[in-house]
Structure formats: C-alpha cells, structure tokens
Amino acid sequence: MDKERLKYVLKEGEELPLPSMHPRALKLPLNSGKVLVLVGIRRSGKTFMLLDVMRQLLAQGVERGQIIQLSFEDDRLQPLRAGQLDLILHAQAELHPDLVGKPRYFLFDEVQNAPGWERFVRRLQDTRAGAVFLTGSSSRLLSREIATGLRGRCLSYEIFPLSFPEYLAFRGLRHEPYSTSSDAVMAAALDDYLQTGGMPEVVLAEEALRPRMLREYTDLVFYRDLLERHRLSNPEVLRELMRYCLAAPACLFNPHRLYLDLRSRGLAVGKDTLYRYLGHMEEAYLIFLLPVAERSARKRAMAPKKLHVVDWSLGYSYQPGPMIDRGRRLENAVFLHHRRQREDLGYVAGPAEIDLVVGLDGAEAWINTAWSLSDEDTWQRELRALQRPGGPTTRVLVARETAGRVAPQGTRIIEAWRYLAGEERA
C-alpha cells in the first residue's frame, strides 16, 4: 500500500456526498466504548449502515476529517501487507494536520482483507479517543480473530437482508389498524416481499434489473468469499452446490444424495470436500443448516439438517422465481424472522414435522407454516403435528391464507403478514 495513493483514496472519500439512505431497524450505539463489528452476507446493507454512522457523527458536529472511512476491497490499496496499516494514520495526519489530537472515528469495510487488522484495531482502541466500526462478510474469520485479539472489546451485530417491517419501510407502506383495505395492502406486500426478497438494492431497483443484480451478487460471493478466500480447487462442484442450495430453501438437506448426483454427472468430489464447501457457504452467511431439535449434541450432528438461505431471491440467479415453491419461501422467511433474534433454533423430523422449534435446550415454541389452509389434508396434517403430546404450550400455525379456519385450544393461527410484521408474536 502506497501512502500517497492512500491520500487520494481518503480525500476522494471525504469529497463524495453521502447517498440518500433508508434507515434500518438496528440502531448502533455511537459511544459504547467498544469496537462495533457488523457481519453478514454481501450487499445486505453493512456499508450503508457505516455511512449512516458517519451521517450521525457529522450531525453531532464531528468534522469530516476526523472520520476515516476505507474499504479494504479497494484495489488501490493493494497489495496490502501486514504492518502497513499505520500508513492510514500517517496519511490522515498529513491531510489534516489541524485535526491531530482530536478524536478519530474509524469506519473500515470488509476488514478481513487487511492482514493483521485485529492488532491494529486493538491499538486504535487503546490509544485513539473516538470509536471504531468494522464490517466483514465472514463469520468464522471475524469470530476467530476477535476471540484472539479483541476478546471483551467488541460488540458484534449480524446484518441480514431486509426483514418484512424494513421492506415495508423501504416501500413507504404502513399498516392502518382496523382497516380491511390496509390489511389487504399488507397481504399483497408480503406476496411481493416473498417474490422480490430483501436485498436492499434489489428492492429499490427497477424490476427489469433485478435478475442481473442477483446474479452479480451470487457471483461476487462465489468468487470472493468462497473460491478466492478459501483457495478452493473445484469451482464446478462449488457452483453446483450453490445452485442446489439456493434453489432449495426450507428443504431437508441430503449430502449423500447430492454426492451421488454430482458423481453421476462426472463431477469428481469427495464427501469431505462437499461438507467443507458447505461450511464455507455458512461462514459467508449464504446458507443456514438448521439442526434437529434434540438435546443431545451427537444426535443433532448425526441427523439431517434443514436448509435455509439468507435470501430466497438469490435462487433466481439460477432459475425463475415461480420455480421456487412459495410455501417454502414463506417458511424460510419465518425462519429468518427468528434467526435475526437468536440462534438456538431447530426442527422436529418425521411425518408430523415441526418446521421450527424455538429453544433447543427447552422448547419455548413450535411453529409450522403453510401457504393456504383451504385444503383439508393440509389443515389436518398441520394440526396433527402441532397437537402431538409433549412440547411447549406455545404452538403457532403461520399461514398466508387462513381460509377462515378456527384453531383448537392450545394452537394459534396467525396470518403470515401479521406474524412477520411483528403485529402478533408466538
């Protein structure tokens, strides 16, 4: 990294006007005394949240030269070697000698690309009054380096694509209580959400541009977060694995069947490689593998996982939207609704399957989802699952179309839009 070139990068960032921003539900503390770390899938809004932090700091009277904002994916910073991060401080001091001694605010994007970043950030926190905000797109990399270099010094936040309430806010929609017409607008908005997904830029883009944007997103994750970061040697297998996972939200995942399918098509791959690639996809926040709800860690590890994706719209990169079942999209959305809040989630396998169990060490709620309850077989199947003996007192059936069904005692039916909007809770 060259210091003179770095000055141009810093100055360019200072001169660019802040873009218009839609606020997210998460409000970051500006003066926590901790390093704030935002982790999540690419294009989920982490960078815009950093820019919103900058906007708030400027509104509080902080001078623009006190804010150092850099993306470590900027090719002008390459090659970046360990020990060169101090050049950032030197370059900023030379650009703004009048601000030396004032608090500095550091906003670093995709920080995992900077060798030795955790030691540098620790020193910033120890020696520079102000605050440090970081983003990254690898859960394992950040958690490992935070654990070794910044234990007890960080507040970490997972950033997901838009929730349904955030989607409504982005579109300028608001529910009016006790209004049947407003209820209908909310239900239609949910249909749109389950089609469009929650990637912020995609939601705001023209419909004709969305497929191309989604394909670019998946390509970016494929190359940068998977192939290049982990130096994977079998891109064909990785591409097929991504295609398979993104097209199968809310499905039981059978690695052995996929292994046989890939082998039958002439793609040589070992099972260990397949599991390793899956782990990398989880680290990149592309997928989530939901375990069976068992107290035994061994049973959880041995049983099949249920696959969920960070945003079902990414599956449209490989096939048209209608090919992905809308009921599975709804189930995936309900999973994400809870995953944003906690990690101890599971499912119950078997003929009377429970889609989502909240609380693995002691079930707090059973939640099933269905698109429509008008079909008698669907209605009876969901009831049998939720009314099985044992389990928690909270049992909820979330449906897009309730068809006027009345739940028996001990079970609640909640319209999907109300549930995902937070108007009714489990």
Over which residues does each language-model region extend?
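Interdomain motor-coupling "hinge/lid" segment immediately C-terminal to the ATP-binding subdomain
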Residues: D2-R5, L10-E15, S139, R144-L252
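Conserved lysine of the Walker
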Residues: K46
